[in-house]
Amino acid sequence: MRRNSLSEKIGACGAMLRDITPLTVSGRIVSVSGLVVDVAGLAGQAFVGDQLLLYGRDDASVRAEVVGFHDGLAQALPFGPLNGLGPGQTVSLLPRSAGTLAVSDGWLGRVVDPLGRAMDGRGPLPLGLLPRPIAAAPPEATHRARLGDRIALGVRALDLFTTCRLGQRLGLFSGSGVGKSTLFAMLARAAVCDVAVIALVGERGREVREFLEDDLGPEGLARSVVIVATSDTPPVLRRRAAYTAMTVAEHFRDQGRSVLFMMDSVTRFCLAAREIGLSAGEPPSTRGYPPSVFADLPRLLERAGPGKDKGPGATGFITALFTVLVEGDDTNEPVADAVRGILDGHVMLDRRIAESGRYPPVDVLRSLSRAAQGCLTAEERLLIRRARGIVALQTEMADLVRMGAYRPGSDPAVDEALTLGPRIESLLRQERTEQTSLDAAFQMLREALGPAGLPQ
């Protein structure tokens, strides 16, 4: 791990000094409507993204984020309940450092909230030397490294049919109740990486502890930082959880490490952004989503990937897996369509496959890794191509076979598909705790296809 140079530390201190608000800037609450608090007296002092401290009755206070301006008033969304807030109460502008995180290696093994505070009852988090803005820009495209070698995800269906590379971004698309969370847990436990950063955005509260103790386990947690914003938290915190998690991942990537970033789910991030946009007065457009939602998506997703090119062995990578909960199993709904256009590949989970009892229910014919060709050997490409062809032909002929309309021996290619297809299906079936290396997965596919699957 490289130590930060003295000049970098001095530069960071200078940035912190520039961001300090020299005097206490105060305003007052004008109105409270829905989720929005309108604040007067901050013109020229507060900007979008700044944080405020709202003082309610009985000396209680709650933080809020400025999300827009209207008629000279700052529109703020609180990080907590609105109870006790009313017109005339005092508002203070917090220093710009409130929008940064001082991440350190001591965060490994910890559970963190969207504001960078510990949630696991193990005391405060150790702070790093360099505060990072949570709304940082992605690395410049011309200075970014290229994708690295392939990474073992530990799930055969993905390692074979959507082979992933270091720095690649994959989306896991699924309807509700299809098995997305199960696959997410398998990947969190089995994927090979130096550090895992896991964002649970809008999850049910009861599922968080189950994930930490049953799915991740002590060994998995030791190499991970988990950022949690449950479904009952305000939308501004649910959205911030994703940015906080990405900021943590960037800290470890900039050290030259291989980081696995996992987020469940992008859909709930977009729903939170929709609540914020509509509350700020944005007009709804596609299916009720305001334009800002589709502007936020690339700003977040593009931050994952390779870091700056520092040469072999020194470049860090954020390999990202984003889950997308599609509405009504419609993979072309606005969020799914936008995410699929940004990412480097997609894994489609199919309800019919799940109902047949095969888990994980990955539809290998509809799943794709755009970067796989750059990390497969000629023999492996042939194996995958043949396996896809067999699965496609078996799927095409399934109805005719069930009806008894196909007579064995009529077509050698169909006969081969009907013979080898069940072997591939068996290969794709995997228990939650079962792990397979990349080499073992390809060897299992060779054995399933038999001699005909090998290059001539």
Predicted regions and their residues:
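P-loop NTPase nucleotide-binding/switch module
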Residues: 91, 99, 119-168, 181-186, ...
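P-loop NTPase catalytic core
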Residues: 160-161, 167-456
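Glycine/charge-rich, flexible interdomain linkers and switch-proximal surface loops
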Residues: 24, 106-107, 245, 317
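Acidic-enriched and Gly/Ser
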Residues: 2-11, 18-22, 31-153
